Structures are given as structure tokens and as C-alpha cells.
Amino acid sequence: MIALLFLLASTACSQDDNVTETEPDLVARARGIHERVITLDTHNDISTANFTADRNYTMALSTQVNLPNMEAGGFDVSWMVVFVGQGDLTPERYGDAHRQALAKFEAVHLLTEQIAPDRIELALTSDDVRRIIAAGKKVAMIGVENAYPIGTDLSNIELFHEMGARYMSLAHNGHSQFADSNTGERDEVWLHGGLSELGRKAIAEMNRLGIMIDLSHPSKESNMQALALTRAPVIASHSAARAVGDVSRNLDDEQLMALKENGGV
């Protein structure tokens, strides 16, 4: 939406200064842009409670994202997020988190394969996105926020890939088994000094499979190390510029320049 507003402003400024566009004119221009380009949201948190036969995204729920809103707003691609909050680094808690993550994967598959396959489809590649949109449907993609549910068994990364994950962050609000979180700035207590050895191995596996590394939430040191290691472009799915919003989970100029050099977004 920010990009759209910027484009509208840029376009309006290029017009004759003596020509004033009315609000209906601007709305029509915005709708025209939506009809010509693929619009996407790279981070849509979901609840499994909204993926049931009685309550789901075919309905006008109070959620920001649902099919009626997507269709009315000309919104094409929703990255639905498999998120499990950070817990203790123990086998028991890894198992609990893994089960919660699988339930969210299954919720997205339920929506796209059983509840509304005629209106929305899961995409695994950019070619899928174009094909689905050409067929007149909306697109779901899956990102993983916090690799904590992987546990210490890196074969779970391949399982998540098979279930549709195409990006994953290595930490959230709290240090994970893979990487330090930005939240370490609160007390300057760090667990790994960036990435753990397991985190370095996870990056190699994600590169092999084709899962983008998400820089949103890990610490600066974790992100800089990830950018140095990765062989593929990364994503900051829901971050802002720290120079504008000075909070620890935003990216400072050094990280943004490294992101540029990486070819990521």
C-alpha cells in the first residue's frame, strides 16, 4: 500500500500542476494500477480458528485479510505466516512448537484445497503465482516466522519446504537455537553472538531447498552473518528503516546496504 501511494503521488506530480484530480479520479487511477500489477502482502499472521468449515476466509471476517477483502481491494497474493512464539530450548518444547506449526500449515492447505479451491490456490513458485492470477484466483503463499519449531533436526526444514514454506526467519522475540534475536538489545544478553552453528547449517539447507532467509526479528549480528553466508537473495518481510523508527527490530543503514548488495528485498 505504501508503494502504491508513492506511485500515485509520483504520477500525480508528473501531471500539469494546473490539473486537479478529484478523489474519484485518484481512486480510479489506483484501481487501474491494481488491475495491471501483482499486489502482495509478505506477512499475514493467521489463526487456525479462522480456517474451519464454520469460520474461514471465504467470509467477511474482522481480519484484515480474507477473500472478500482481497477481491474488493484488488489484492492478489497473501503470504500466510506459520508463527510459533519462542519457548524454552528443550526437546519437549520443540515438539510442542512443531505440532503448532504443522497445524498452521494444514490450515492453509485446508483453505486452498478444500474450503475454497475455486477462489484461492497455494503457490510454490513465481510461475505458480502468474498462472493462478491468470486463472482469476487469489494466491496464498507460506512463510515461517521463527525457525524454533524446526527443533534441532534439520530434516524438518525439508518437511516445511514440502508443505509450502518459501521463506523462514531464524529467530523471533527471544533467542532461538539458530540465532540471536533483536530483543537481546534490551539487556545486552546474547546466546550465540549472532548465528549458532546449527543456524549456519540451516542457512545452507535453506539455500539448497529454495527457502528465502527472512531478516525480520533476528539481531543485527545474526543478519549480517546470514547475509555473508547465504548464496541466495534474502527478504526482510516486515521490517522498516531504523533511521526512521528507532526500534531494535528495524534494519539500520548497514543492514540495508548489505541487503541491497545481496539483491534481496
Q: What are these model-predicted stretches?
A:
Residues 1-2, 19:
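Short hydrophobic transmembrane-like helices used for membrane targeting/insertion
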Residues 13-190, 246-265:
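N-terminal hydrophobic targeting/anchoring segments and the immediately downstream early-domain regions
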Residues 198-265:
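Catalytic pocket-lining loop regions of alpha/beta-barrel enzymes
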Residues 194-195:
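Cysteine protease catalytic core and zymogen-processing segment of caspase-like enzymes
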Residues 2-10:
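Bacterial N-terminal signal peptides
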